[in-house]
Amino acid sequence: MRAIISLLLISAMVFYIIAAVPEEEGLQLSEDERGGCLPHNRFCNALSGPRCCSGLRCKELSIRDSRCLG
């Protein structure tokens, strides 16, 4: 019985610690990890994902053409 209670307490503590870490903090990548950005021509880098370095959103105009929009 003590083992079950101890296991439940340990599980609760682990869950609490995991829940305390913000999701976004673990998901955000630096510009280098995203593959860099191309702010000079306001095009989205294919490796940078859906976001642009300047905080603008990436709109896909076609498969090969995406632009950063406000």
From Swiss-Prot:
What S-S linkages are listed for this chain?
37-53, 44-58, 52-68
Positions of modified residues (Leucine amide): 69
- Name of protein: U2-agatoxin-Ao1n
Species source reads Agelena orientalis
Q: What residues make up the propeptide removed on maturation?
A: 21-34
Its Gene Ontology cellular component terms are: extracellular region
The family line of this record is:
Belongs to the neurotoxin 01 (U2-agtx) family.
Q: Its function?
A: Insect active toxin causing rapid but reversible paralysis in crickets. No activity shown in mammals. Does not show effect on mammalian voltage-gated calcium channels.
The UniProt comment on domains reads: The presence of a 'disulfide through disulfide knot' structurally defines this protein as a knottin.
Q: Provide a Gene Ontology MF annotation, just one.
A: toxin activity
For this UniProt record, the keywords arranged alphabetically read as follows:
Amidation, Disulfide bond, Knottin, Neurotoxin, Secreted, Signal, Toxin
* Subcellular location as annotated: Secreted
Signal peptide (from-to): 1-20
Pfam families assigned: Toxin_7
